[in-house]
Amino acid sequence: MTSRIQPKSGGYLLSKSDFTKVFEDVPKIAITSSVDLRNKFDNVKTILSNTSEDWNKRQTQLKTIRSLIINGEKLVDRPTMIAHILQLLGCFELAVKDLRSQILREAAITCSFIVSKYGIETHSIGEDILIPAMGQVAVSTKIMATSASTLTEFIVEYIQTRQVFTILSSFSTSKDKNQRRQLAVLLEIIIGKWSDRLKKQIIRQICELVKSAINDADSETRAAGRRAFAKLEEFHSEEADALFLELENSKQKMLRGGDAASSWASINSDKGSIPIRSKLSAGAKGYSNISAKFLAQRSASAIDPKALKVTGPSRLARPLSTKAMVRQDTSPAGSKIPYPNRPGSRTRTSSITSNDSRDTSPTRRHSPLPPDTQKARVKYGNGSFFAKLGMSDNTDDDEFLLPIRVRSPQKPNLGDSPADNVSRVLKECCSSSVTEKKDGIKKLLPIVSDTTLSSTEIKNIGNCLNRLLSDASNTKLILQMVLEVYAVFIRTHSSRLSEWLRLALAKLFARKATETLPNTKKQINHTLNVILECFNAHHQLVTVCELMCDPIHLMVPKARVALLEYMTSLLDEYTEPGASINHKELKAALRKMFTWIGDQRQSILLTPYIEKAICSMFCVNVADFSALISEFDSDQKAWLHQTLQLNGLENGISSGSGGSGNNHPKATPLRETPHKNDSVVLPEFGSAQKRTAINLGSFNTSTNAALSKLEEQSTSRLMEKMNLNSTVTLPPDTLEKIQNVQDLLHKMRVSKDPDEQENAISQVYMKICDGGFGIWEQCYAKLLLNLFEILSTSRSENNKKMCLRILGKMCTAQAAKLFDSTEMAVCKVLDAAVNTNDATTALAVDDCLRTLATHLPLANIINIAKVILIQEPIDDERASLVLKMVTRLFEELPADELKNVVDDITPCVIKAYQSTSSSVRKTVVYCLVAMVNRVGEQRMAPHFTKLPKAMTNLIQVYVNRAISTSLPRL
């Protein structure tokens, strides 16, 4: 590493800056083509999957991954590169779990580089390696623990998903203080950097975790919890107030005072303290209004202890801010007056020499921050921090005590009219200074919320926002602030922005075309959605058509794509069926679309979006659409007719232009298919369904008759469901997605080349991860059958692993659709695990079985488990996996639900202890321990009477050891 910090305890500590410095410190690799890049990734996967490989080679391959990403991004597009990276998911898990510090460090650097570069697009990597990374935080080796800690910080910052928070919550009850401390650190990142939309869903859980950290037994964890509380106060003050009231009195004092004890000691030390009377007399020269008698009283105590009513600190009243432990005098004499703010306390008056006096030290500067900002940033900070900032938060008594300060009177802005104020803020927004521009945008936000703005002010604000949006020099933060102001401005004044809308849309489309960051694009889409909601749909449609034909605003191709997407959303979601669309602006827009299609340089990019927009127009009003294109030439009409038919719209364009104007199209078959029930699928899937029904028997690789029967029943139910699901009527916007997915499914099934099959599987997996697989009704059953066949027959371990991950995602997203195929799914996953020596495949099988067990019907899971565990002779490999699955079942599900099945499954689990395999017997013990922890010893006692005493004692030992970690998750 180029930068390392060696602590006193030995070892090295790694920080985020250390990681960032070596992200691109890798050997350069020559890559000739995309095929060469894929081969190099395959070679990396082969070496990293083999845990017995030399560790130097594996460390080098982890660096190679970063080099391939850096040097290969010019040869392939972003989705292809991400697909290559996702194939290494199992390798990353193994590397992060490795016990050698060099491997873990390099894996942490590489994974941090990936998640920081690709963000949410690689969320599956971050979610899968977060658990092993948190596990490594607990190790005693500093280099390993800090590498894992830094990796978790990168993951939490860039992978903002609910799953990440769920995983972190599970460590709140960890027995290791390092893991709990790291959780508190990560909570600070979540509170400060996650989106408000996501935090709103989990804010209650966040508060509970912060509360747990504040009450932790470890002092460093408590300190991290207080920092997280300060961050919570900064971003969510109401929730912080509620949490403050829930804390014990002692914890409230800690939040109010922070490290006040250390500050108190330093202030009142023999060397640093000065008698208050002498300090005041030195600093009060020339200020005759301060009574010497009063000062003499104050030096001892300004409060009559007899008149003081002693009360305990209230838990219901929370102070607005912590009082600083030191007050600083700014009188001309430069004296400083240290005294505590505790009633009745005395200041030490030990005499000191002039050499020790603080009068000789340089005068500390006041913080340049305004008081409000200081209070917001350190409202619950410690006393020493307040003293460093030189903050003053005085009571009335304190103000009376301090010398009078001559302040220059502030100039009141009485002459500034509201219009002048708006002009001044707009001028700041257009400043070349980044700081001044940020301040101006912050001031602009409350201004645009004012409903009493004049028309001139609204026009000026709109022009300023458009200039800010088109300024390419703006940082990401400034752009986000501008878009927030945009949204508020539109919601408040949409009725007065009709003329401004056209220019605003042009700027938004142009900005969206140039942006590459997903989060920024998402915020631009949010602003466009606000426009869709606030403006009249007809006015928006006319405005978009005029913008499309505007000879001045010549948009780049990607901006035209953004316009077409906006137009499609407007027609599909915000335009009422039957609304009139027979307008000259729409006719001109259609002609412009044909012009774009005729341009060979742009047609490939724009044609799919143009087809969607045309289908959306047709669906709004068939009669008006027919009248709209009546003057088009025959070639254009033929192309429109063919486009509508290919997208499943009945009879294409109606022959007449008359009608009621609210005719609605109906979905029809895309093409003639051999299968009479397949009304919306391509022909190859109609025939594939027949072949699948015939060859389903070949899926069965189990020799057990009971398993065969379960699979046959499950297959029959699945085929019935697939036939029922094949006649669903579809809206036009999903037909293209269906065709794309069906092409991928066809490649998955018929391809004999493992690489080609792997590419198709990877694309399906990416669609599911990105949320683009929204057509479950038509493709779920077919995809499921393809996965089952690959799991049973494929010789490619990579393809099996990807299929297992897809099956887990399908179960998580649409568990109800898999209910009828529970037994078959479990059998196929077990088939994939048999006769494999790949460690990453075993990990994928365990994860998939866990997902199936916790999402599918409990009765079906218990049924298949019983069948496998009572086999004679017992199948050790399958039995071990099933026992792990049952263990997860009892760890995850509530006790009330499990009590109904515990008597059925326990005898089968105990019988499995007769296996000759030590791994099976060990898994049986862990399974019984999980049962005892979940349903209680009393419920399990009747079953334990049949066990040998030695085994009962062994189980009791494990129960006592695990009972503290078996609590339900938050």
From Swiss-Prot:
GO molecular function terms listed in the Swiss-Prot or TrEMBL record: microtubule binding
Region of interest (Disordered), ranges: 314-377, 651-675
UniProt-listed GO biological process terms: establishment of mitotic spindle localization; mitotic spindle assembly
One cellular-component annotation, GO: spindle microtubule
Regions of compositional bias (Polar residues) in chain numbering: 344-355
Placement of HEAT repeats on the sequence: 905-943
Pfam families: CLASP_N
Compartment(s) where it occurs, according to its Swiss-Prot or TrEMBL record: Cytoplasm, Cytoskeleton
Keywords associated with the record: Cytoplasm, Cytoskeleton, Microtubule
InterPro entries in UniProt: ARM-like (IPR011989), ARM-type_fold (IPR016024), CLASP_N_dom (IPR024395), TOG (IPR034085)
PANTHER family reported in the protein's UniProt record: CLASP (PTHR21567), PROTEIN CLASP-3 (PTHR21567:SF34)
Similarity field: Belongs to the CLASP family.
Job of this protein: Microtubule plus-end tracking protein that promotes the stabilization of dynamic microtubules.
Protein name in the entry: Protein CLASP-3
Species name: Caenorhabditis briggsae
